[in-house]
Regions:
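Active-site phosphate/pyrophosphate-binding segments
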Residues: 2-36, 134-138, 142-255, 263
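Glycine-rich phosphate-binding loops that contact phosphosugars or nucleotide phosphates
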Residues: 34-181, 210, 245, 253-284
């Protein structure tokens, strides 16, 4: 079994530890965000995709205006972000906590604005800790493989839990405790069908998702490039109609994460996609 598959299969056991960590640090996390008026979420690569999810989740669950920024963008264009940063807390996302853009961006924010900085990463004692006020460390979620899987899913779980804590959604936080018990049997039941779909002769993947999971889905699309070297893109559900739809055909695998929102609008889109490709995986 490849290392990446080992880490992928371990993600739900790791999720239980991540949820335990959220409960253990619940009071500290709530206090850190209690008087925050706005927040900037920084990351690179996969973590930047997750920063987009984090910004949406914090806005939806806690009513905190949140802006996702690629850490490299911030470094290059730091003066342009002055008004965005000067009264905002900073949330850093990183697998290693050592990514140079993230560490340097944290240092600049602390030096220039005295920013309150929170970090979620999967390595203890990382360089970024020299600039942070609070760290949530998830060492059990650290991926050694180049392509992140377990790290991504656990960072997302931590972000969802953080948003629940900030918004006082105790029921949502409590529900996360059932992730491992639910997810492992569910995934094992789908494995044969997924293997069959993977072996079909598609050449490109399109991942559709809205709202909080959209950033996670963007990272999912990136995984096709990194792991199986297939061209891939993420789009918001209805937004795929505005241009990208013309490239969907029988050579394209479409994965759609359906939300609990307007079901008729989503069903109409999926019906149109099904006319273009039979390779349609709907996650509902």
């Amino acid at each position: 079994m490849y290392l990446i598959e080992q880490e992928l299969r371990n993600q739900f056991a790791a999720a239980t530890q991540t949820v335990d960590a959220l409960f253990a640090h619940k009071d500290a996390l709530a206090q850190a965000l209690a008087d925050v008026k706005s927040i900037c979420v920084l990351g690179c690569g996969s973590s930047y995709s997750l920063a987009k999810s984090a910004a949406t989740l914090l806005s939806q669950q806690a009513g905190i205006p949140a802006t996702p920024i690629a850490a490299g963008d911030l470094l290059v264009n730091f003066p342009a972000y002055k008004r965005t940063l000067e009264h905002s807390a900073i949330l850093l996302l990183s697998r290693s906590g050592a990514t140079s853009e993230v560490v340097r961006a944290a240092a600049l924010c602390k030096q220039q604005f005295g920013s309150r900085i929170l970090s979620i990463c999967t390595q203890a004692g990382a360089p970024v800790e020299a600039h942070t006020d609070l760290d949530l460390i998830l060492p059990w979620a650290y991926d050694k493989a180049v392509c992140q899987t377990r790290t991504v899913s656990n960072l997302y779980i931590a972000l969802l839990g953080l948003a629940y804590i900030a918004g006082g959604n105790d029921a949502g936080l409590q529900a996360l405790k059932g992730l491992e018990a639910y997810s492992e049997p569910f995934c094992s039941q789908q494995e044969a069908a997924l293997k069959e779909l993977a072996q079909q002769p598609w050449t490109r993947a399109v991942v559709l998702a809205d709202s909080g999971p959209a950033g996670l889905a963007e990272e999912g699309a990136l995984a096709f490039k990194e792991i199986c070297r297939r061209d891939s893109n993420h789009y918001h559900m209805l937004d795929v109609r505005h241009g990208p739809m013309v490239q969907i055909n029988q050579d394209v695998l479409v994965i759609a994460l359906v939300s609990s929102g307007d079901r008729a609008l989503q069903a109409g889109l999926l019906a149109d996609i099904a006319k273009k490709t039979s390779r349609l995986l709907v996650l509902d």
